[in-house]
Amino acid sequence: MKKKNLITAALPYVNNIPHLGNLVQVLSADAFARYSRMMGIETLYVCGTDEYGTATETKALIEKTTPEELCNKYYEIHKSIYEWFNIKFDIFGRTTNKRHKETVQDLFLKLEKNGYTTEKESEQFFCKQDQMFLADRYVTGECPNCGNNAKGDQCENCSKLLSPTDLINPKCIICKNIPIIKTTKHIYIDLPKIKDELSHWMQITELNTNWNTNAIKITNAFLRDGLKERAITRDLKWGIPVPKKEYENKVFYVWFDAPIGYISITKEISKDWESWWKNNEETNLVQFIGKDNILFHTVIFPSIALGSKENWTMLSKLASSEYLNYENLKFSKSAGTGIFGNDVITTGIPSDIWRFYIYYNRPEKSDFQFMWDDFMERVNSELIGNFSNLVNRVLTFYKKFFGDQIDKIEIKEDFWQEINLKYDKTLNFFKQVELKSALKEILDISRTGNKIFQDKEPWKTKDSTPQKTKELLLNLIYLIRDLSILISPFIPHTSDKIRRFFGNSYEISNRFLGTNLGLSTIQFTEVLFIKLEKHLINSLKLKYSGSKNMQDEQTSNQINPINLFSEQVCLKVVQVKTIERNPDAEKLFILKLNDGSSDGKQIVSSLADYYKEEELIGKHIIIVDNLKPAKFRGIKSEGMLIATEDKDKNFKVIIVEDFKDNPIPGERIILESDSYKELKSPAKISIDKFFKTQIVAENGELKINGINLILEHSKEKILSIEIPNGKVY
């Protein structure tokens, strides 16, 4: 039996911000790595950013920077997002490190020495407009296999690997012009020559391990159709140089160098890296990828390893998944649809809630649509109504009626036989990387605990049979300890919090399951989560639905935003008096405001990532004064401040300053067209209604349908100086 688990998640491209769908792989690998450590298995979890290639070079041109600077910028963005999601890499590296260059070139030279490379001239698309050879993914056209739109390396619809010249009606993705064909010379990996070794390895691997059905199907179909020589060099500047004469101005194809990144990144932290990567007898290599990456991990990367004739650790378990999509739309920063990693951080919703929902719906066998309403329902009913409820009700009841001490009793309640079978089932799901099933089994155990508590009615028996009632509750407390261990791969912050309830008296280890070990006192208890409120979910749904969708909704409902604002919205200037951080959510500021009234107002806002407290105290800001009161993490909020956000997601609170007459706290903000009207104080409204007014910043001025917003008394225009153009919300 193999003793070690070497776990990788597909290296994310560094030239973008990851969205929820991109996070599936790193989160899945994180859960499996945490399970592996829980079982006492020596574990290494490796990931990093994929930084070379045309996509990076082109993005750098767009952002008017160098590829190196672009990679540095996005590496930090990726790293910060993964840290917020509490992903516990053993290393999160980069393919631009020195060891990567050495490793890629060394493997190439071994392939060449062993006769697994060829050289030949080929026809490649060249864009006359942009004066450059076009990378595969910078040519689009019709897939010759299924007829769908595809890029020049692979069709995402049917997963067929392509060459750009295979496409029907090809176009340059940059300028949309039709490219011409020019002759160029490249090095190819001779896959047909490796086919017998690859097929033999595939047969052994399929017999000894479990691959996702879709992965086996796609790989076998690819082998059945026949392997072809595949270019591993290209005409680019940004990449690993080819160590061969006549190829000084070419680099390695990113698909060739990227998988090797798993090895080179491991070298960065371990001098003993060969004990992981050249130890096939004792090491399980478990790789987490999306379905669009299957062939690169089942054919290309294994072929490189086999062709080198070295004893590389080969793929044991391929955990491929389908796509996580968004509200029947595509994730798109430019269109404003979908929620991305940096957006998630600003919602005020804890990372464990996001982790829970992604695992609960992990797209293991089919694509899944992220839906806000389902997000709220699953979190409130399963995570909070089921799991959190069991922890809270049992510990609170025990502490209230039986004190802090946890007696060491014999585990003998009748329910343990059923529970232990469920433990075995859960651990087997983990082992097979059926993460969604593992989580749902854990939730089923929690439901069983709730049912036992409800059926036994300890509130009725605590006085008549106190010892028996106490023993029942103690058994349930040991069940809660076990649940905190089993669920730790999915929601680690919450697991740690439950452990703190017990004074961190036990470890996240399977050796405690079903035992009476590791508990002595309940030091404190508190609610694990606050329910998600409908108004918050509706506001997030609207915010990330894209401007076009918002306009479509507005048109379909025949809403006039000017009339809506005049008749139903009340914006006011307020002065920030004090700011505190929410003790249960550090990202949330609690702002005490002077609104001209004797009592003032209080609002809660997710500003901690954007401002320090002292930057806002004393400033005049704008709030939606007539919003229905709401609670955020248990704190009452009596309004919402407004801010501007541009297309790059830069965010600034609108500060009302630099007027001839200082703004008066409580002064209303109105449309310029209403400056001579007598306006009534409108009734309380939902946040959805406010968003339908569609306030925008245009050339530094706040407007609705071209009409300026102004201060009611001084008639001064409301300005957005720091972000002159963008959405206001």
Curated annotation (Swiss-Prot):
This is Methionine--tRNA ligase. It comes from the Bacteria. One of its GO terms (biological process) is methionyl-tRNA aminoacylation. Transmembrane segments: none annotated. NCBIfam families: metG, metG_C_term, PRK00133.1. SUPFAM superfamilies: Anticodon-binding domain of a subclass of class I aminoacyl-tRNA synthetases, Methionyl-tRNA synthetase (MetRS), Zn-domain, Nucleic acid-binding proteins, Nucleotidylyl transferase. GO terms for cellular component: aminoacyl-tRNA synthetase multienzyme complex; cytosol. A motif ('KMSKS' region) lies at residues 330-334. ATP binds at K333. Its main location: cytoplasm. Belongs to the class-I aminoacyl-tRNA synthetase family. MetG type 1 subfamily. It catalyses: tRNA(Met) + L-methionine + ATP = L-methionyl-tRNA(Met) + AMP + diphosphate.
